[in-house]
Design a protein with these regions (language model features):
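Extracellular mucin-like PTS domains
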Residues: 26-54
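Second-shell loop/turn segments in exported
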Residues: 59-61, 121-129, 227-234
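A small/polar (G/S/T-enriched), proline-flanked helix-loop surface module common
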Residues: 81-205
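A short, solvent-exposed beta-edge/loop patch
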Residues: 49-52, 63, 168-247, 252
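Bacterial N-terminal signal peptides that target proteins for export
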Residues: 1-8
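C-terminal motif of bacterial Sec signal peptides marking the signal peptidase cleavage site
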Residues: 14-17
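Bacterial signal peptide processing site
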Residues: 19-22
Length: 254
C-alpha cells in the first residue's frame, strides 16, 4: 500500500475507535459519570413519573441496549468486526459534557466494523432516563459549537495516533465540520460530518466521518461512518441507518 493509503487506513481505524468500547466507556451521545441516576423512566416510556433503579433494572437496560446494536451480518460481504479495545474516555467526551447532555442509564457499544476502500462503521446504543433527555442528546448534534469542539478533539486524537516512526512527515490538518442532512429515521434523527485533511509529505487527501443519532423513546442509537478519500456512500449510510432504527424500535418495544 502506498504511504498515503497506509496513513489513511490507519487514520480511518483510529477515527472509528475514538468512540470507545467496554463497560466503562462512553459513547458519542453520553456523558461520563461515576454514578447511575437514582431514578429512571423505563426505556420507551413517556417522560412522566419515575421508578426506582435497581441492579436488575440496569442489567435489563443494558440487555436492551445490546439487543439494539448492529451486527456483522447487517453489513455487506467483505466487512470484518474488529476486536474490542477499552478506551476509558474517548475523544470528544468533554464536548458532550460541555453541551450538557445527560448521563445515560445504560449503554452498549458494538465492535468497530471495517470494510473495503479504507472504510469503517461504529455503532453505540444509549438508554437515557427519559425521552426528553434522549431528545436533548439528539438535538445537541445540531449545535455548531459542539461540532466544532468535536472536530478539534478528533484532530488532536488523530495527530496523537500517527506512528511517527513510519510517517515522519505526515500532517493532520484542522478538521472542518457541517450539519448533515439525514432522513427522518425513528422518532427523531440528526447528523453531522467531520472532514479531516491529511498529508503524507507528498500527497494530500481527506478523511470523512459522518455521525448520525437516531432516537426512539428514551433510547438513542448512534452510528459513525468513516471513509477515506471520498465521503461515505449515501445509499449505504441510509440502508444501515434504517436497519439500526428498526432494531432500536424492536429492542425497546417502541
Amino acid at each position: 500500500m502506498a504511504p498515503l493509503g497506509a496513513l489513511l487506513a490507519a487514520a480511518a481505524l483510529a477515527a472509528a475507535g475514538c468512540g470507545g468500547s467496554g463497560d466503562e466507556a462512553t459513547t458519542v451521545v453520553r456523558t461520563v459519570t461515576e454514578t447511575v441516576p437514582a431514578t429512571t423512566t423505563p426505556a420507551g416510556a413517556a417522560a412522566t413519573g419515575t421508578t426506582e433503579t435497581t441492579a436488575p433494572d440496569r442489567r435489563a437496560a443494558r440487555a436492551t441496549a445490546e439487543a439494539a446494536l448492529l451486527r456483522l451480518e447487517d453489513l455487506p460481504s467483505g466487512w470484518v468486526a474488529q476486536d474490542e479495545t477499552e478506551e476509558p474516555e474517548p475523544a470528544g467526551a468533554a464536548c458532550w459534557r460541555a453541551a450538557g447532555v445527560t448521563a445515560t442509564v445504560a449503554d452498549a457499544v458494538a465492535p468497530s466494523f471495517t470494510g473495503p476502500s479504507m472504510s469503517a462503521v461504529t455503532n453505540a446504543v444509549a438508554l437515557f432516563p427519559d425521552a426528553d433527555a434522549a431528545s436533548a442528546g439528539v438535538k445537541a448534534v445540531g449545535d455548531a459549537k459542539l461540532r466544532a469542539c468535536l472536530a478539534r478533539e478528533l484532530t488532536a486524537f488523530l495527530r496523537g495516533s500517527i506512528d511517527r516512526d513510519r510517517y515522519e512527515e505526515a500532517q493532520v490538518f484542522d478538521a472542518e465540520t457541517a450539519a448533515l442532512s439525514v432522513a427522518p429515521y425513528g422518532a427523531e434523527s440528526a447528523g453531522f460530518r467531520i472532514t479531516v485533511p491529511l498529508d503524507d509529505g507528498t500527497t494530500r487527501a481527506e478523511l470523512y466521518g459522518d455521525w448520525i443519532a437516531i432516537r426512539d423513546g428514551a433510547a438513542v442509537t448512534q452510528l459513525s461512518f468513516i471513509s477515506a478519500i471520498r465521503p461515505p456512500e449515501e445509499a449505504f449510510r441510509d440502508d444501515l441507518s434504517r436497519t439500526a432504527a428498526t432494531r432500536l424500535r424492536a429492542a425497546t418495544g417502541g
